[in-house]
Amino acid sequence: MEFDTIAAISTPPGEGAIAIIRLSGPEAIQIADRIFYAKKNLSEAESHTIHYGHIKEDGEVIEEVMVTVMRAPRTFTREDVVEINAHGGIVSVNRVLQLLLRNGANLAEPGEFTKRAFLNGRIDLSQAEAVMDLIRAKTDRAMGVAIRQMDGNLSRLIRNLRQEILDALAQVEVNIDYPEYDDVEEMTQRMLLEKTELVRASVEQLLQTASQGKILREGLATAIIGRPNVGKSSLLNQLIQEEKAIVTDIAGTTRDIIEEYVNVRGVPLRLIDTAGIRETEDIVEKIGVERSRKALADADFILLVLNQNEELTVEDEALFEAAAGHNYVVVLNKTDLETKLDINKVRELAGENPIVSTSLVNDEGLEALEEAIKTLFFAGDIDAGDATYVSNVRHIALLHQALEALNAVTTGIQLGMPVDIVQIDMTRAWDLLGEITGDSVQDELLDQLFNQFCLGK
């Protein structure tokens, strides 16, 4: 398969030390040669070499650059690739790109370089999606999972499962088409059930990692809730180590929702500092309270903050009711002051949920809180090198569908259905697993997936 030659800026827009303009395609080296001036033509250059020179337009030098030449097939796209390293100015970089376009290159679509790597067989679809996961990773663990997926760990597992299914289907077909062959082992219902159970167990094992994988990939929407002036904004600022929220002794000073991402011991949290939830006549504060209630309803995880220096109120107890059904940690703040809170009542309300004491004004208790969050979601350490990790929402959905098809095979066999009937669901499971790696996928889905990438990737 041969495509045209594409070009795009691969680095983020704006001022910086360098910017990279990438070309890929059959004419990549020739097009770059038309605008690059040095002692040696790029067309004569060996693969994976770097060359110093200038970019000229109508005889005028417009950039001083370093150019990398990489010849097919030992490139990301398996095509000839040229990368021009220029100074990171907005005007100069765009001028170089426009010059390439005028000399025969076409502007790349979002994700087109990665799409070509997939279409040319350099990577499969799950590996291509892992590229975006790596770019978006917010923690070292998330990065580790993405890198392992890019290396093909998930792909190999899925292909092994598909091969198990294919072997069973092939034997069923031989039995149906050539029943007179005595030397071909008959695929009995018992044998097919054993094959199905083997694949089904592996799919279930993959899905068991999905919840933690989804946390690593997307982060947890974390609502910090509590009555006004219990220390919610102080907690936010301590976790992110920045003064993002207003901290005063005046109740109700947080009128809006403040969001910030933070990495807590490998757990990516999207922290939402909500306005204090209470009954109020202040119109502006009332809007903030309503937004807080919505954030609470949508949250994956809750930090419920109480003031240890005050007695438990009806509003506090209502927060426990609102948090029911969520994972949450109770934060008993202001331990530097006299304890007036009924701790036994708090334990009763919290049930099995962790309780951590803090004095945010004295920087006390934060480590214990971080450890409680890590333990709550990651029982022990996640092994980012685990080859069976699944974190992509599309993959999880396909695995669930494949599991349903495999369950249908098991049910059919147990009901005594003929092997040639239950093989329909077996084939469906094979197809669904193939959609994860891109071995069976529609063009419309490919366009949708790769359009999520940035230009130049």
Curated annotation (Swiss-Prot):
Superkingdom assignment: Bacteria
Pfam families: MMR_HSR1 (PF01926), MnmE_helical (PF12631), TrmE_N (PF10396)
Keyword Magnesium applies: yes
Domain TrmE-type G stretches: 219-378
GO MF annotation: an example: GTP binding
Positions annotated to bind GTP: 229-234, 248-254, 273-276
Compartments, as annotated in UniProt: Cytoplasm
Keywords: Cytoplasm, GTP-binding, Hydrolase, Magnesium, Metal-binding, Nucleotide-binding, Potassium, tRNA processing
Quaternary structure and interacting proteins, as annotated: Homodimer. Heterotetramer of two MnmE and two MnmG subunits.
Protein family (similarity comment): Belongs to the TRAFAC class TrmE-Era-EngA-EngB-Septin-like GTPase superfamily. TrmE GTPase family.
HAMAP family linked: GTPase_MnmE
Name the record gives this protein: tRNA modification GTPase MnmE
Gene: mnmE
